[in-house]
């Protein structure tokens, strides 16, 4: 049973890469995501996605090499456009209708400009909307972009698919085998404990707009469906 009707999925760009095969985009993973979205949409759930660009570009390391932060962030925005177009193609191959909407001005042959009314129309028609370009401004993360878009389209929940991490812990589980996993936690507790889930702007915005957050391991089989149905190890963050 899925209790949400409109969701936003936050996918990290880094999670798309297949380092073993030396691929920037793992299309096998894209196909697995697409097959899950088909099932979810058939159940009446409206799906939007915000994708990062970390598989192509890491802005923090760029700054260390003399590239100004604002320019590095714009390069990162272009990286999200590439990921969004790749997702769109993978989804369409699976029989889904998908749109890419960009928060930065880009040739309309490549992607549409983001217009809220159009987004809602597409979602109501059962199409997947992929948001690219982050917030369109430097100094903001794609986590903040995800929360911003979720608030604008009135999504009830953000699904944050992590790479081999199945939720929120009190410390890094990859470094501390005794890290404590939270099945449920509030945004205020995250802020108080200074847990690295989303940046402070995104966390506060999600809390203030009463948007739930589900953090789960994207790489598990049928993870998106199971996360929505509560049948996978995850963390639910609420106000």
Swiss-Prot record:
HAMAP family per the UniProt record, alphabetical: PyrH_B (MF_01220_B)
Function: Catalyzes the reversible phosphorylation of UMP to UDP.
Keyword entries, A-Z: ATP-binding, Cytoplasm, Kinase, Nucleotide-binding, Pyrimidine biosynthesis, Transferase
UniProt main location, coarse: cytoplasm
Entry's localization field: Cytoplasm
Keyword ATP-binding carried by entry: yes
Pfam families assigned: AA_kinase
Catalysis: reaction(s): UMP + ATP = UDP + ADP
Ways its activity is controlled: Inhibited by UTP.
Subunit: Homohexamer.
Enzyme Commission code(s) on record: 2.7.4.22
SUPFAM superfamilies recorded: Carbamate kinase-like
GO molecular function, one term: UMP kinase activity
Binding of UMP, residues: 53, 73, 135-142
GO biological process terms, semicolon-separated: 'de novo' CTP biosynthetic process; UDP biosynthetic process
PANTHER family recorded: URIDYLATE KINASE, URIDYLATE KINASE PUMPKIN, CHLOROPLASTIC
Single GO cellular component term: cytoplasm
Designated gene of the protein: pyrH
InterPro entries in alphabetical order: AceGlu_kinase-like_sf (IPR036393), Asp/Glu/Uridylate_kinase (IPR001048), Uridylate_kinase (IPR011817), Uridylate_kinase_bac (IPR015963)
Residues that coordinate or bind ATP: 10-13, 54, 58, 163, 169, 172
Family: Belongs to the UMP kinase family.
Known pathway: Pyrimidine metabolism; CTP biosynthesis via de novo pathway; UDP from UMP (UMPK route): step 1/1
NCBIfam families: pyrH_bact
Broad enzyme group: transferase
Name of the protein in its database record: Uridylate kinase
């Amino acid at each position: 049973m899925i209790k949400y009707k409109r969701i936003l999925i936050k996918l990290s760009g880094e999670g798309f890469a297949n380092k073993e095969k030396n691929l920037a985009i793992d299309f096998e993973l894209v196909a697995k995501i697409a097959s899950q979205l088909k099932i979810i949409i058939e159940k009446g759930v409206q799906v939007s996605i915000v994708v990062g660009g970390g598989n192509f570009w890491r802005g923090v390391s760029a700054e260390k090499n003399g590239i100004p932060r604002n320019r590095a962030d714009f390069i990162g925005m272009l990286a999200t456009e590439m990921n969004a177009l790749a997702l769109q193609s993978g989804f369409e191959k699976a029989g889904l209708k998908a749109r890419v909407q960009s928060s930065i001005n880009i040739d309309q042959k490549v992607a549409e400009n983001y217009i809220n009314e159009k987004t809602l129309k597409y979602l109501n028609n059962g199409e997947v909307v992929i948001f690219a370009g982050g917030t369109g401004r430097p100094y903001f993360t794609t986590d903040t972009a995800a929360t911003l878009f979720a608030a604008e389209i009135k999504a009830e929940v953000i699904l944050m698919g992590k790479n081999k991490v199945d939720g929120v812990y009190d410390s890094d589980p990859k470094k501390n085998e005794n890290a404590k996993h939270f099945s449920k936690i509030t945004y205020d507790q995250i802020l108080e404990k200074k847990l690295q889930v989303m940046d402070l702007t995104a966390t506060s915005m999600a809390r203030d707009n009463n948007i739930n957050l589900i953090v789960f391991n994207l790489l598990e089989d049928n993870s998106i469906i199971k996360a929505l149905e509560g049948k996978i190890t995850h963390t639910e963050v609420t106000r």
